[in-house]
């Protein structure tokens, strides 16, 4: 009888430890899925030249957008334009305008997408290539910082490299 009560105690302790972990895993998985949906909406909006949808994915009252040349690209630019800057600021609004007005088909393809989140903030990191008129005109790495707002997950900042 003592063995059975000890076994019951061990099982009860195990279940009490596993249940909260599974609930936390489920919440984390739901956040990752929601962020992945933002990634997919971003890609679809570019292809569709849909500036309204694309703009809705960003935190509206905040803007941090940086482009950084990779070494080879930087060396080429510096040779032609000695006063050029390696790191350049822009805005998500300018990107939305570009997407809406591009006369050619455009697409950004993502590879090796990695998402991390604690449910309040998140990050997305991936390799990409950007196509214009069916031809690659940029490739590199990109990262997004994301925040969970009253309206769901939003991109709060973006950093990407420019390469060939």
Show which residues each predicted segment covers.
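Positively charged n-region of N-terminal signal peptides that target proteins for export
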Residues: 1-6
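A mature extracytoplasmic/lumenal domain signature
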Residues: 58-59, 69-70, 126-130, 159-160
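Short, low-complexity N-terminal intrinsically disordered segments enriched in polar/charged residues
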Residues: 19-60
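Bacterial N-terminal signal peptides
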Residues: 7-17
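Short, solvent-exposed secondary-structure junction/capping segments
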Residues: 43-44, 56-76
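Surface-exposed, charged secondary-structure patches
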Residues: 78-136
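Short beta-strand edge/turn micro-motifs at domain boundaries
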Residues: 123-125, 137-164
């Amino acid at each position: 009888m003592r063995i059975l009560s000890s076994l019951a105690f061990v099982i009860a302790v195990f279940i009490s430890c596993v249940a909260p972990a599974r609930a936390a895993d489920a919440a984390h998985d739901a956040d990752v899925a929601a962020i992945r949906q933002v990634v997919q909406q971003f890609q679809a909006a570019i292809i569709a030249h849909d500036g309204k949808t694309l703009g809705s994915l960003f935190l509206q009252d905040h803007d941090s957008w940086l482009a950084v040349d990779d070494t080879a690209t930087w060396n080429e630019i510096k040779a032609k334009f000695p006063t050029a800057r390696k790191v350049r600021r822009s805005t998500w609004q300018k990107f939305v305008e570009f997407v809406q007005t591009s006369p050619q088909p455009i697409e950004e393809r993502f590879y090796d997408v990695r998402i991390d989140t604690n449910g309040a903030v998140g990050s997305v990191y991936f390799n990409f290539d950007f196509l214009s008129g069916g031809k690659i005109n940029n490739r590199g790495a990109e990262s997004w910082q994301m925040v969970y707002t009253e309206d769901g997950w939003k991109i709060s900042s973006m950093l990407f490299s420019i390469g060939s």
